[in-house]
Swiss-Prot record:
Residues 1-12, 174-202 have a biased composition (Basic and acidic residues). Residues 1-202 are annotated as: Disordered. GO terms for cellular component: axoneme; centrosome; ciliary basal body. Residues 106-117 have a biased composition (Low complexity). InterPro entries: CC_domain-Cilium_Assoc (IPR051885), CCDC113/CCDC96_CC (IPR025254). Residues 305-441, 505-531 form a coiled coil. Signal peptide: none annotated. This is Cilia- and flagella-associated protein 184. Forms a complex with CFAP263; the interaction is required for functional activity in cilia. One of its GO terms (biological process) is cilium assembly. It is found in: Cell projection, Cilium; Cytoplasm, Cytoskeleton, Microtubule organizing center, Centrosome. It comes from Homo sapiens. PANTHER family: COILED-COIL DOMAIN-CONTAINING PROTEIN 113-RELATED, COILED-COIL DOMAIN-CONTAINING PROTEIN 96.
Length: 555
């Protein structure tokens, strides 16, 4: 069965869901908030997206026609190729009221009939990612005018009706083709080995599906991060523009207040503020009520978006399961046909060799399909990034064009202030010129005095040279006198050493006293010696007597 026949009905069903998803919040926002004019970059991006969708659909038609040429092998495939031009039919652009949602929601190209389940799942994941980004950006977009919304709804109604009718017809044709193919497969019957190969391929497909689901999740996270960064940059640009406009208004107010008379203007402003206080309070309460209504409306819209997102995810999962089922059926049928063709050719090695060769061919085909799906996924990412960059450039250009007038007014104000400063500087310049003349006179007087001081310094220098010569002469005389003084001092010391105690009465008197004392001490020493000698003689006599007495005593 041709896989592209199943994808021909997807734009219709998804278009209806996307139309209902985008039409409901636009009506609510248009009725609740004040109408705001759309950005010029959004209006310019809409026809370019329509041209890209038509080019992608034409490319899908050409690829389908090229892929359907070698499919006339069996009657089952011929029955599945009823409408080769249907997958590539250019999808009619759906006019949605929210322009930024169309930036990232470019309709993907139709898959080729030979695409694998991994590629189909990746494309379905990218489509789901674009729808999620569309749902996020709708919340941040201002509502369009009521007249434009009514015109778009009136233009979108017949297109949605025709797409619904075409989707129902394609569903009927698909059910008929499924019944015919099931009958043919029941009549032919497949061998037990082909069933085992199908089970093995099914297990491998499930493992690859898990890997692709992780990659799709990473892709969704990257896309969400890029969307949030884009929103942050746009809000930052809006903040800068508001700040500049605030400065412009402050300059205006400053100029208006400066033109008025100081105290009177302040009194009039106070009276006006007292009169406008109740009106401002009422306006504040009214805006608070509007804010509460908008918050409630935002919560309702968010709940509705979550419900629609869950429904779209379920539909996407059902379509993915159908695509995988049809892909496995198509691979099994292709293997059976190739085995029959090789069996009719009577290859060397028999059925086992043919089976091995078919497995190698299918493995190579799976590898190429994976490479092709990876390249297509990268192509989709690059297209989305290109669209984001283009919209960002357009918004920046629009903002710069809108800010040129504000810049011009600010430059006018700055020019006026600079002119006033120039007048002040001219007055200061006149004052400085008068000061310069006075300074020149003072400088000439100072120069004359400086010349006189130079002449006086020259005279002083000559006098200083003479005084320095005299000082040098006195310095030489001083050194000579110091040398003579040192010689006299040494002579005096030598003579003092030679003369001894001559001329020193106290020392001489002390010397005489010491001599007298020494003589007295010598005489006393002699008397003591004599007394000691007498004592020793008496001691000897006593000892002799004691020895004699001991000799007479009995022993």
């Amino acid at each position: 069965m041709d896989v592209s026949s199943e994808h021909t009905k997807d734009p219709g069903g998804e278009g209806g869901d996307g139309e209902s998803l985008a039409a409901r919040p636009s009506k609510i926002k248009a009725s609740s908030g004040p109408p705001t004019s759309p950005e010029p970059g959004e209006l310019e991006s809409e026809p370019e997206e329509e041209e890209e969708e038509q080019a992608a659909s034409q490319g899908g038609t050409a690829a389908d026609e090229q892929a359907e040429a070698p499919k006339g092998l069996t009657a089952a495939e011929a029955a599945g190729e009823e409408g080769p031009g249907e997958p590539g039919r250019p999808a009619e652009p759906q006019p949605e009221p929210e322009e930024p949602a169309e930036v990232g929601a470019e309709e993907p190209a139709q898959p080729e009939p030979g695409a694998g389940p991994e590629e189909l799942e990746a494309e379905a994941g990218a489509e789901e990612l674009e729808q999620a980004a569309e749902g996020k950006e709708v919340r941040f977009q201002a509502s369009l005018p009521l007249t434009r919304i009514d015109e778009e709804e009136a233009a979108a109604a017949p297109e949605a009706e025709t797409e619904r009718v075409e989707g129902e017809e394609e569903d009927k044709e698909e059910t008929q083709r499924d019944g015919a193919e099931s009958k043919e497969r029941d009549g032919e019957g497949r061998p037990a080995k082909s069933q085992e190969e199908g089970k093995r391929l099914y297990g491998r497909d499930e493992f690859e599906d898990l890997e692709w689901s992780e990659e799709v999740q990473k892709l969704q996270e990257q896309q969400l991060r890029s969307d949030l960064l884009d929103q942050y940059r746009s809000l930052l640009v809006e903040r800068n523009r508001s700040q500049r406009y605030n400065l412009y208004l402050q300059h205006k107010i400053f100029e208006a207040l400066r033109r008025k008379k100081g105290l009177e203007a302040a009194e009039v402003a106070d009276r006006g503020a007292e009169a406008e206080a109740p009106e401002k309070e009422q306006a504040y309460l009214r805006h608070l009520g509007m804010l509460e209504e908008l918050k409630k409306q935002q919560a309702d819209d968010l709940q509705w978006y979550h419900q629609e997102l869950g429904q779209l995810k379920r539909q996407c999962q059902e379509k993915l399961t159908r695509v995988e089922k049809e892909w496995r059926r198509f691979q099994a049928l292709k293997k059976q046909v190739v085995m029959q063709a090789m069996g009719s050719c009577r290859m060397r090695g028999g059925r086992q060799a043919a089976l091995r060769e078919v497995e190698q061919i299918q493995a190579l085909e799976d590898k190429k399909e994976k490479e092709m799906s990876a390249v297509r996924l990268e192509n989709i990412q690059l297209k989305q990034s290109l669209v984001h960059f283009e919209t960002r450039m357009r918004t920046q250009e629009d903002l710069t064009q809108g800010l040129l007038l504000i810049d011009f007014e600010q430059l006018k104000i700055e020019n006026q202030t600079f002119n006033e400063k120039i007048e002040e500087r001219n007055e200061e310049l006149l004052k400085l010129r008068s000061k310069v003349t006075n300074s020149v006179q003072v400088i000439t007087h100072v120069k004359e005095k400086l010349h006189f001081m130079d002449m006086e310094n020259a005279c002083k220098k000559t006098q200083l040279a003479e005084i320095e010569a005299q000082a040098a002469l006195g310095r030489d005389i001083l050194t000579k006198t110091k040398q003579a003084r040192e010689g006299l001092r040494t002579d005096n010391i030598r003579l003092n050493q030679k003369c001894g105690l001559l001329g020193k009465d106290s020392l001489l008197r002390d010397l005489e006293e010491k001599v007298d004392k020494t003589e007295l001490l010598h005489r006393r020493l002699e008397s003591l010696k004599r007394h000691h000698a007498s004592l020793t003689l008496s001691c000897r006599g006593v000892r002799q007597k004691i020895r004699e007495a001991k000799a007479f005593l009995p022993s």
